[in-house]
């Protein structure tokens, strides 16, 4: 019997979803803190449709898991399963602006053309040494190890560079056994190591001054506004669930600051 989801912490039921173990890793890590549900409107907790794909009817499903803590404003996972059309985990952890913390970002996308996989602790104030020094000194060695085992994902848009750190792990992998092996043997342990570092940063974070928190908030808003405007999943989501639902999901859930 299918269970209804009443809040954003309720379990997700997605049959044969490629990224389930990654989400389990994230939830387990976040449960080290006292988490509570993040308020997600009911229409975005679970969404199902049937669409036409290559002359076949397929079911597509979108589910949202989200929480908050005393230091995390919103940690949310957007989970999409569309069989041969797409399989997606987009995880963003957004800290409160009164802590000197980056964003955590993981974007794992499987499409008919291959896997697009990105992972980073994204700076709020990229040109600010105080904001980045402690993070990058620990992140870059982790990145360099795992990125050396993966092909490069290619260049990123110049306008987006300000929102990525030198520890941005980015790769494209084929839809074959080798790609699946790299996801299991490289991407997942890299994800776990990035996540462990981020959880440690949260644990150690102390409140900053009001003046500093306003600088951080300004940087967070710049990132959130950019992501909402340029979200590369917009077209896919609109094809699956319609333009109106997609725009509301992007602005009310995914990037709601």
Swiss-Prot record:
Keywords: Oxidoreductase. It holds the Pfam family Fe_bilin_red. It catalyses: (3Z)-phycoerythrobilin + oxidized 2[4Fe-4S]-[ferredoxin] = 15,16-dihydrobiliverdin + reduced 2[4Fe-4S]-[ferredoxin] + 2 H(+). Catalyzes the two-electron reduction of the C2 and C3(1) diene system of 15,16-dihydrobiliverdin. This is Phycoerythrobilin:ferredoxin oxidoreductase. Belongs to the HY2 family. NCBIfam families: PRK13249.1. It comes from Prochlorococcus marinus (strain MIT 9211). The keyword Oxidoreductase applies. The keyword Ribonucleoprotein does not apply. GO terms for molecular function: cobalt ion binding; phycoerythrobilin:ferredoxin oxidoreductase activity. It comes from the Bacteria. One of its GO terms (biological process) is phytochromobilin biosynthetic process. Its EC number is 1.3.7.3.
């Amino acid at each position: 019997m299918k269970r209804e989801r009443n809040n954003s912490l309720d379990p997700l039921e997605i049959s044969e979803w490629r990224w389930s173990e990654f989400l389990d890793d994230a939830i387990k890590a976040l449960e080290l803190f006292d988490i509570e549900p993040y308020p997600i409107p009911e229409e975005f907790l679970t969404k199902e449709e049937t669409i036409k794909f290559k002359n076949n009817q397929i079911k597509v499903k979108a589910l949202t898991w989200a929480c908050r803590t005393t230091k995390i404003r919103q940690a949310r996972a957007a989970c999409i399963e569309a069989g041969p059309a797409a399989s997606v985990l987009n995880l963003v952890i957004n800290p409160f602006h009164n802590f000197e913390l980056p964003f955590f970002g993981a974007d794992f996308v499987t499409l008919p053309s291959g896997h697009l996989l990105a992972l980073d602790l994204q700076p709020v104030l990229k040109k600010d040494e105080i904001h980045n020094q402690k993070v990058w000194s620990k992140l870059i060695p982790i990145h360099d190890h795992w990125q050396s085992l993966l092909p490069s994902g290619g260049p990123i848009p110049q306008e987006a560079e300000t929102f990525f750190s030198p520890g941005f792990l980015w790769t494209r992998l084929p839809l074959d056994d080798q790609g699946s092996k790299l996801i299991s043997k490289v991407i997942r342990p890299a994800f776990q190591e990035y996540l462990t570092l981020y959880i440690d940063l949260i644990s150690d974070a102390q409140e900053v001054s009001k003046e500093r928190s306003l600088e951080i908030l300004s940087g967070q808003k710049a990132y959130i506004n950019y992501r909402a405007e340029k979200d590369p999943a917009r077209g896919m989501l609109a094809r699956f669930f319609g333009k109106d639902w997609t725009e509301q999901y992007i602005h009310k859930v995914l990037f709601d600051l």
